[in-house]
C-alpha cells in the first residue's frame, strides 16, 4: 500500500481498498516526459500521446513547456493547441519579462535570464497558426471572462489531450469532464487542496467515474504544497489514458515512484515525495 495514504485510511478498510485498487498505475508501455524537468512537465505513455491530435490546455500561468513540447511531437500545419487562462496575457508576460530583465543586471542568474525571455517564448508559441491563447478562465458558468468546458467541447473533434492545472478550480469542472469523456484520449489533471476532506471525497467520486473508461498511467505528488497534518499530500498530479485505445491485457505496474529520469520535484528546494507500491 502507499505510504502516504496508510495513515489517513488506516481505520477505513473500504477506502483503503478503493485507493489500493485505483491508485496503482497500469503498465501502458514506454512512458515519456512532455515539458520541462520541474513544475509544468508531465508523464504520459508514448503510444497514448501519439493518438492525440489536439491539446486543450486549461491553466497556463508562466510555464508552458508542455505546450511547446506537444508542438514538437506533432507534425501538422493546422491548429494544435487551444489554451485558456485569464491570469496571463501579452501585457502581463511583457511586464514579467521586463521586471526580470532589470533584476538580471543587479543579481544575474540563469533562472532570472529564463524568466526575462518568457515574453518572447510566449509570442513565438501563441503567435503561430498552431496555437492560440484565450484570455478566459474555464468555469461552470459562462461570463465575460470565462467559458464553460461543455461549450468548448461542442466544437472540438475527437482524440484530444486535456491538461487541467487551475489551482483548485478543477473541482467545479468534474461533471463537465465526465460528460465529455468520449472526446478525451488523455486527461492530465492536478487535484489541489487535498488537505480539505471535502475535496478528498470529490477526488474519490471522480476516480470511480474516470476508472470506468480510463487507465491511470501515472501519478506524482507535487512537493510545492507539502502534506497535511494527517500526512495526506496536498496536491497530486494524475495522467489518465482511454482504455478503448489500448490493448486489453493491461496489468497494474508495481513500481515505486518517483520514476528515475521521468519524475522530477516540482520545487527544487525540497526532495520529491516517495510512493511505495512494492
Please tell me what each predicted stretch does:
Residues 26-144, 193-195:
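SAM cofactor-binding core of SAM-dependent methyltransferases
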Residues 14-15, 23-27, 38-39, 112-119, ...:
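Short amphipathic alpha-helical surface micro-motifs
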Residues 135-147, 166-168, 175:
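Conserved SAM/SAH-binding loop
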Residues 9-10, 22, 105-111, 154, ...:
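Short, flexible coil/linker elements and helix-boundary hinge sites characteristic
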Residues 1-36:
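Rossmann-like AdoMet
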Residues 52-56, 66-80, 92-95, 151-278:
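Conserved acidic-Pro-Pro-aromatic motif
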Residues 1-2, 20-22, 103, 128-131, ...:
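Short N-terminal helix-initiation segments at or just after the protein's N-terminus
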